[in-house]
Amino acid sequence: MINISMLISNSEVSGPGGLFDFNATLPLVAIQFILLMVLLNILLYNPLLTIIEERKEYILTNLGKASELLSEANKLTQQYEQELDNVRKEAQLEITNSQKIHKEILEVELNISQKYIDNLLDTIQKDLLAKKNIALNSLDEIVQSLCVDIEARLSI
């Protein structure tokens, strides 16, 4: 193990070139530090900053495009929903109109059928009445002839 007291005793200033010697080493270290900062700035920080800026611009442009597309999609959605509502209303009107038309057609056909049936019943009644009258007349004639025959037989 390293003893702390030995480190302290070894770091004591025993002449020139100690721990706090301010000859040319301090400006040299400062120049090295500045050169290292310039090199790091040129080689590392500037490319990183440009990449970060490019990514930031890329993200912002894509975000802008995405928000534009989203707003356009929302507009199209609203437009299509409006058109869908209009089409539904038109379809409902068409359905009600066609139902009315079919109902009117059905009523007309029922009226025509009713008139036809009434006419048919009327002609059948007239025909039956005529046949009844003919049958009654023929029956009346037969009865008359039978009566004449009966009278003729009785008078013999």
Curated annotation (Swiss-Prot):
Transmembrane domains' residue ranges: 24-44
Statement: the UniProt record of this protein carries the keyword Membrane: yes
GO-annotated molecular function: proton-transporting ATP synthase activity, rotational mechanism; proton-transporting ATPase activity, rotational mechanism
Keyword NADP: no
Keywords, alphabetical: ATP synthesis, CF(0), Chloroplast, Hydrogen ion transport, Ion transport, Membrane, Plastid, Thylakoid, Transmembrane, Transmembrane helix, Transport
Additional notes on this entry: In plastids the F-type ATPase is also known as CF(1)CF(0).
The protein's name in its UniProt record: ATP synthase subunit b', chloroplastic
Organism: Phaeodactylum tricornutum (strain CCAP 1055/1)
